[in-house]
Amino acid sequence: SDGRNDAAKAFDLISSTVKKGCCSHPACAGNNQHICGRRR
């Protein structure tokens, strides 16, 4: 099987966690714009 699928799933899981937690904090969101988006 292709390991990239597992990596993608792990990345999605991390990203969703970061979106819920980090992205609600302006300083953290600013450091993770590639995940959180650039809205303020």
Curated annotation (Swiss-Prot):
Coiled coil: none annotated. It is found in: Secreted. Expressed by the venom duct. One of its GO terms (molecular function) is toxin activity. Its main location: secreted. Alpha-conotoxins bind to the nicotinic acetylcholine receptors (nAChR) and inhibit them. This toxin reversibly blocks neuronal nAChRs (alpha-3/beta-2 = alpha-6 or -3/beta-2 or -3 > alpha-3/beta-4 = alpha-4/beta-2). InterPro entries: Conotoxin_a-typ (IPR009958), Conotoxin_a-typ_CS (IPR018072). Residues 24-26 are annotated as: Ser-Xaa-Pro motif, crucial for potent interaction with nAChR. The lineage of its organism: Eukaryota, Metazoa, Spiralia, Lophotrochozoa, Mollusca. Keywords: Acetylcholine receptor inhibiting toxin, Amidation, Cleavage on pair of basic residues, Disulfide bond, Ion channel impairing toxin, Neurotoxin, Postsynaptic neurotoxin, Secreted, Toxin. Disulfide bonds join C22-C28, C23-C36. Belongs to the conotoxin A superfamily. PROSITE patterns: ALPHA_CONOTOXIN. This is Alpha-conotoxin GIC. The keyword Cytoplasm does not apply. The keyword Iron-sulfur does not apply. Residues 1-20 form a propeptide. The cysteine framework is I (CC-C-C). Alpha4/7 pattern. The modification Cysteine amide is found at C36. GO terms for cellular component: extracellular region; host cell postsynaptic membrane.
